[in-house]
Amino acid sequence: MNTLSAISNNKQSKELQILNINFNQDQGCFAVGHEYGFLVYNTNPIDIRVKRNFNINGHGSGIAHITMLHRTNYLALVGGGKNPKFANNKLVIWDDLKRKNSLNLEFMSPVLNVLLSRIRIIVVLKNQVLVYGFSSPPKKFATYETIENEFGLADLSVNFTNSIGNNLSTSNSSISSLVSNQVSYDSNKYQTLAFPGRSIGQIQIVDVSPSGQEKNLVSIIKAHKSKIRCLALNRSGTLVASASETGTIIRVHSTHNTALLYEFRRGLDRAIVTSMKFSHDDSKLAVLSDKNTLHVYNVSPLNTSSGATSDLVTHNETYPVNRSHLLGSIAFPIPIPKYFKSTWSFCSVNTNKYHPSGSDNDTINDVGIIGWSGNDSIIIIWQNKKIWEKYVIVEKRNKYLGDINDGLNTSHQGSSNWELVRFNWKNLDNLD
């Protein structure tokens, strides 16, 4: 056994600097780009599936962005870090079965984000979003101008009639067979793409399915007064959630008619919303901010269009109900601040109680990425702490009329309160 090599590899693992984390389309896997290559994990239970080290030959190795294509052997890679594997203005579609590049696209500016489906490659630049066909060579279908989008914000809905893929380690499909084998794909199904508009606070909605590209229609949602900081589509592409750089309000709009369906309050203080995800059944929205607080909102169709809880009608008394302020239901002779009429999450947790931030800047400014496992379990991957966590929504009976400790009214007598409990956690360094 080469002892020096083993020690070196172990030291490299402990010092691993993560550059990017992304869940795949069904959130059953997630990929990690780092200074030496990339890793792919099964989400729950967490288990390492693929480990690629590009640092062996001494050449460039850093991967600053990675996107999986379901569970196939194709991944989108962009170089970065101290010693990049590829230039940051170059997108590589990596065939992990053959361990080589399958497609390459180069641009005049850095690639900030990449979204994949079996028929589309979406490339996000600072002021543009480009739509390509997933073919060899890739054919460009459309270019959309955006406001300065330094965080590469964009999201693509998941068409699950088109999501059947091979295991990452066993797939033998080529690019041509991947695209041509569309027996289960319905070209009339929407494949919604959301990204910032040309003006502050706007979101553009485009259908990038074959039928949608023929129509080439763009819907504009005026979502916020401030610049968009985070956005997310539900699986079916019918809802888009967004937060501005202020971070106090979460709004959910219809992508079909741009109507505002829900308006939720995250908090009173400014915060950066770092991640948002809808649950698999589109009934819940999880939101994580730089304050390390995880909120979950009910966006079930049973809710009213305004998102208010007081008008909720349901025959299931254990169904999660978003909270409202006690003063919001009282009639006052004069108008009261909008804050007291806000709708709040039905459960939340400050994750700092499980892992205090400490004094290290890397952990204080840590970024968590959200994924769902089922409809009641939320996975958070912390980039700097390199921690995987599983939080579960659990029910707790409330004997009283409401919880008045924080001034929020959960619901009526006999209904249920909900809480987020950390069920498990693991350190990514210990999984190699």
UniProtKB/Swiss-Prot annotation:
GO molecular function per UniProt: phosphatidylinositol-3,5-bisphosphate binding; phosphatidylinositol-3-phosphate binding; phosphatidylinositol-4-phosphate binding; phosphatidylinositol-5-phosphate binding
* Cross-referenced Gene3D superfamilies: YVTN repeat-like/Quinoprotein amine dehydrogenase (2.130.10.10)
Its Gene Ontology biological processes?
piecemeal microautophagy of the nucleus; protein transport
From which organism does this entry originate?
Debaryomyces hansenii (strain ATCC 36239 / CBS 767 / BCRC 21394 / JCM 1990 / NBRC 0083 / IGC 2968) (Yeast)
| Protein name in UniProt | SVP1-like protein 2
Give the comment on domains. May contain a beta-propeller domain involved in specific binding to phosphatidylinositol 3,5-bisphosphate (PIP2), leading to the association of the protein to the membrane.
Its function?
Answer: Involved in mitochondrial or peroxisomal functions and amino acid signaling pathways.
The UniProt entry, under SMART domains, shows: WD40 (SM00320)
Keywords for this protein: Cytoplasmic vesicle, Membrane, Protein transport, Repeat, Transport, Vacuole, WD repeat
Which gene carries the instructions for this protein? HSV2
In which compartments does the protein localize?
Vacuole membrane; Cytoplasmic vesicle membrane
A GO CC annotation recorded here is: vacuolar membrane
| UniProt main location, coarse | membrane
